[in-house]
Amino acid sequence: MMQKYQDSSLSPEERASDLLARMNLDEKFGQIQCYNAIDSFLGKSVEKQNPYGVGQVCILIATMLDDVGSAAGLIARLQKQIMESGKHHIPAIFHIETLTGVMVTAATSFPCGLGQASTWDPEQQQKMAACIARQGRAMGISHALAPVFDICRDPRFGRMGETYGEDPTLAAAMGTAYVKGLQDKHRMSACSKHFLGFMAGQGGIHTAQAVVSPRELREVYAKPL
């Protein structure tokens, strides 16, 4: 007999409420765990290693595979094992970096964030993100680690190329367009990154102390988010 949470004709809220009522505390904790799909994860029984289920899988190992078909095959195999091993057959969320495209060999590669911002074209940005979402979902990936909303005003910072640059208004427009393209038709979840003032470290040093006034934090670093 089909349970309510398995009925796709019901709303997500109804299905989630029914499923949560059937899960014990350990199973709920299992859904907030994230595993890296490295050799130690791939080489063991999913059921024995994760008896309470798997919530999310980092699939960066796909960057080491030869093509998108291999990546899709790996994800499908892992997803099948995860769903078959759990009592409630809950699929895991697979995530990967997508700032310049799905980070898999032979997937479409786009310019870096700074290059994207240089177009001054949110409409094209939205189309690019839709393409990324379409390719990611085709491989079984539903969570994108992008866009990067950080504001960077120090060219010494080694990760400046990931950002949309120094202007919070432009970053807000480009990042918002990215999220819309990603989540609209193909429904790939975005992850707005990273933290307020993350790229304001002293000396342009990654993770160095950031000295930022409350006003600058609000008007510059928080604005895109």
Question: Which residue ranges define each predicted feature?
Answer:
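Glycoside hydrolase catalytic-domain context in secreted enzymes
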Residues: M1-L225
